[in-house]
Amino acid sequence: MPLVSMTEMLNTAKEKGYAVGQFNLNNLEFTQAILQAAEEEKSPVILGVSEGAGRYMGGFKTVVAMVKALMEEYKVTVPVAIHLDHGSSFESCAKAIHAGFTSVMIDASHHPFEENVATTAKVVELAHFHGVSVEAELGTVGGQEDDVIAEGVIYADPKECQELVERTGIDCLAPALGSVHGPYKGEPNLGFKEMEEIGKSTGLPLVLHGGTGIPTADIKKSISLGTAKINVNTENQISSAKAVRETLAAKPDEYDPRKYLGPAREAIKETVIGKMREFGSSNQA
């Protein structure tokens, strides 16, 4: 199946009451594990690529070529989107679009509102011309992700969310409502009241960033309030690192990367399968 944008995927998920996971790519093994999990679970999937991970893997074009080749090799039949995670500028989004990404996130949430609207609208115009979906963010998701550091959480303003959607034509919205990137210190405190209000007023599928460590009950509640995309990266990184440590602790003389990265790949796959089942996306493709 060819790569697709997120639009239909997320609208269907919102309608049917489940969420599609965005799982971030960090290297070959992450890409293999996530695609294998999606095909086995018969789940649609979004492959997230941050600017930093894109650079690490040799550029956006390299990532697209790798994903397409693996999809062919694994005979992938489920819908797959390649999505730029936290695109920092119009230029970065344009680069991803021209490299073959099927979806982009423009994150101008740290700029004043009017500037966020102007930048986002410009990205939407280019993206939609190429059949690419667009995600935008309002408020501030806490924690750190690659080049993006946000200390505290600034909740999104429901009225601004509605205005951003109306003035830009984005396909999905990531309102910051208490989630953070990276491991949580204590229990996450999600703003469900705001989530419900934003979901109703915009009518768009909502996106939950920082999906690692959010209790299942909160995940289910978020989905019931219109969240159709949940981002996961830290959990896969932790499980893969744990597998590498365990392998090397048991065999300190091991030097063949396949012998320690193989178990890491399996650990990622298991984690992703668990998330797909939790989000309700298994058997939806």
UniProtKB/Swiss-Prot annotation:
Protein's recorded name: Probable fructose-bisphosphate aldolase
Active site location: 85
One Gene Ontology biological process: sporulation resulting in formation of a cellular spore
Catalytic activities: beta-D-fructose 1,6-bisphosphate = D-glyceraldehyde 3-phosphate + dihydroxyacetone phosphate
NCBIfam families on file: cbbA (TIGR00167), fruc_bis_ald (TIGR01859), PRK08610.1 (NF006376)
Xref: SUPFAM superfamilies: Aldolase
Key words, A-Z: Glycolysis, Lyase, Metal-binding, Phosphoprotein, Sporulation, Zinc
Cofactor(s) of this protein: Zn(2+)
Pathway: Carbohydrate degradation; glycolysis; D-glyceraldehyde 3-phosphate and glycerone phosphate from D-glucose: step 4/4
Note on how the cofactor is bound: Binds 2 Zn(2+) ions per subunit. One is catalytic and the other provides a structural contribution.
Function: Catalyzes the aldol condensation of dihydroxyacetone phosphate (DHAP or glycerone-phosphate) with glyceraldehyde 3-phosphate (G3P) to form fructose 1,6-bisphosphate (FBP) in gluconeogenesis and the reverse reaction in glycolysis.
Chain sites annotated for binding D-glyceraldehyde 3-phosphate: 50
Enzyme class, first EC level, given as a word: lyase
Annotated binding of Zn(2+) 1, by residue: 86, 181, 209
A Gene Ontology molecular function term of the record: fructose-bisphosphate aldolase activity
Residues the record lists as Phosphothreonine modifications: 212, 234
Cited Pfam families: F_bP_aldolase
Gene3D superfamilies assigned: Aldolase class I
Species this protein is from: Bacillus subtilis (strain 168)
Gene assigned in the entry: fbaA
Residues that coordinate or bind Zn(2+) 2: 107, 137
Posttranslational mods: Phosphorylated during sporulation.
Classification via PANTHER family: D-TAGATOSE-1,6-BISPHOSPHATE ALDOLASE, D-TAGATOSE-1,6-BISPHOSPHATE ALDOLASE SUBUNIT GATY-RELATED
Enzyme Commission number(s) of this protein: 4.1.2.13
Membership in a protein family: Belongs to the class II fructose-bisphosphate aldolase family.
InterPro entries: Aldolase_TIM, Class_II_FBP_aldolase, FBA_II, Fruc_bis_ald_class-2
Record-listed dihydroxyacetone phosphate binding positions: 182, 210-212, 231-234
